[in-house]
Amino acid sequence: MAAELPFYIASSVEELVKKHVEGVEVDKNYSIFHYLSTCNNLVKQADIYKSEGDIERTYIYSLRFCILIFEKLQKHPDFNKESFTKSRNEIKRKAELKLKELEGLKETLKKGYERIQHKKEEERKRIEREKEKERIFKQEKLKLEREQQLLREEEEQRKREDLELESEIQRLKEVEDFENRKLQAQKNIKRATSARTFELLRQEALLEERKRLQGIETEKKRILAEKQEALEKEFQQQLFEQQEKERLEKERLEKEEQLRLASLPPPPPDYSSFDSDQLLNLIENNNKKLENNNQTDDKLDNEFLLDPSFLPPPPPIITQPSPSQEKKDNNNNNNNKNTTAQLPLSITQPPHMPNNEKKLPPIYNSTSPIQFGYPSLNNSVNNPPSFSLQNNTPLIQQYKQQQQQQPIQSPTNNINRPNIPQYNNYNAKPLSSNLNPLPPQYQPQQQQQYQQQQQQQQYQQQQQYQQQQQQQQQQQQQQQHQLPKLPQYQPIENKSISANGLAQSPAVNTPSITPTTNKPNIDSSEASKKYSKLRKIIVHGEVFQEFMRLAENNTKRSIETCGILSGTLSNDVFRITTIIIPKQEGTTDTCNTIEEHEIFEYQLENDLLTLGWIHTHPTQDCFLSAVDVHTHCSYQYLLQEAIAVVISPMANPNFGIFRLTDPPGLETVQKCKLKSFHPHPPVNGIPIYTKVDHVDLIWGKKSDSKVVDLRFLKK
């Protein structure tokens, strides 16, 4: 037995019994198993505190134990139940031993309290003696202080008289100095008045001169402003006239350009799709036409033979000409100032496809008139090209290959390209030989608006994605602050266990999580502050994994599994060392133990205390249902540190540790007589249960914790 600890709970045996033993009652609604477990807990705690030398707590738990056994528990209707005969006899035997120990403990407590009272009395007398000595010392000190006060008063009186004499002499000197300063001040005032008058006159003269100069300057500014305003009006009039002339000139040029474009001949047919026979027939027909045509060159222009498959050539690719080409262009422009660009018509080079060796088409801009490279009718008609049947087909194929290799420049790829006619389909046929359909025109503003809309949609999607990521991070941080998460549960196949201690198997179809109603905020500060300081409980997390492995068969069938948390007490700290899985009957929402005497007998044989209970929620979240709070009330009523552990493989986090608030949760559930599922609203804003803060959950360290399965124990 350890050394006896000093008494600290009470000052007498009567006070100890009144505060910590009286008020123990038996509730018939709680099973006899809970009371027998409580008796076992009491006697175990009494033995532990006795070994630690805590006589007061040993007496408290021993007296509670004896009162329950010999007075209160015999009134329970199941006390004489046959299945608990062995356990009941063992408890009675321990109660008789504790009853004998109580007399010795009571005498030890009385002697200890008497020693404490004697020490208190001695301390009181010592304090009185100290007070008497202090009183005499204060009287002598006060007398000495009075004598010293009289001496100080006489000295101060003498000093005051000396000070009064010095003060009178000083006053006379000050009067004389005052008269002298008064005379000097009057002289200074007269001198200052004269100087101020002179300064005022000088300032008035300066002010008049300044006003005169300001008037002259103002007049100059006014005249200058009038001249400037007249010049601006004249300049604006000239500018307006010049702009009007430019506008009229621009309109005239635009009309001339429109008339010139309207008079242009239609573009030549596309010879690239013709074979050699078609080209020969076309040339023969054209020659016959020309022989029969005796009109002028202008009429020949209008009556030029059009192929039914005619379409205007594709838009020229805008390229930057080389310096040599620019020089060549300038020479051609000087020779042909009033004509359009001319291209030779030959079988090897279509008119709308310039050769690399030929002159490049001019770069169009928005200010210069638009010109199309049509072939000259005079040259093409008067001097028809000669065709060779032997070389027709290879040349056409070569031309088609060049046309396929030639890159087609899209209008959208060059934002600086002028707004010129564009043709989308080069194989489409015109409605008639004399009517060309208007081609669609490229509109850069629509393209820019479309790109802006796409950018805005992408930006909004990015903002929504970032907000969702921030919300998920905040939820994860809140969950990490609440409780550590058990490794994700998975059902096992053929009892194969993974490296992290939980079972691994193919997925099993499980019902969806049942949505729960609005549960109270069990994490609120009010809920955690409403119960007194509790003794700490230490538990290793690996024992929960082992429990889930053994409960896997029920979990796959969506049936709840329960167990009893058992452990030891040392240095005022509980340690959960064993989870007992008893014989039980379970459904998807409830779990009831049977053959409870086996649990109690195992605890007696292994010196274990009941510290709470554990059960699973295969299809629900981690919380205490109405049935669960009534079940836990029987544990916490008999041991205020008792906890309830809920494991839900489908929740996140997948387990929780709870207890009833005290007050008001424990008292509320005790008074509730309803059965089955029913709501328990918060009381004055405080929920009836909360998460615990007196449990230390340890992971990764080696421990001797275990799970004992009594479900398959033979009778």
Swiss-Prot record:
Q: Where is this site: Indirect zinc-binding?
A: 560
Copy the domain comment.
The JAMM motif is essential for the protease activity.
Any Pfam family from its record, for instance, is USP8_dimer
Which residues are listed for Zn(2+) 1 binding in this entry? 615, 617, 628
What does it do? May be a zinc metalloprotease that specifically cleaves ubiquitin chains.
Q: Which gene encodes it?
A: DG1039
Positions of the MPN domain:
537-666
Task: Give an example GO cellular component term for this record.
Answer: endosome
- Do you know which PROSITE patterns this protein is assigned to? MPN
Question: Which residue ranges have biased composition labelled Low complexity?
Answer: 398-409
Species of origin reads: Dictyostelium discoideum (Social amoeba)
Cysteines engaged in disulfide bonds, as pairs: none
**Regions of compositional bias (Basic and acidic residues) in chain numbering:** 287-302
Cofactor stoichiometry and binding remark? Binds 2 Zn(2+) ions per subunit.
* Annotated binding of Zn(2+) 2, by residue: 630, 672, 678, 680
**Domain of life of the organism encoding this protein:** Eukaryota
Please identify the protein, giving its name as recorded. Answer: Probable ubiquitin thioesterase DG1039
The Swiss-Prot or TrEMBL record annotates one GO molecular function as:
metal-dependent deubiquitinase activity
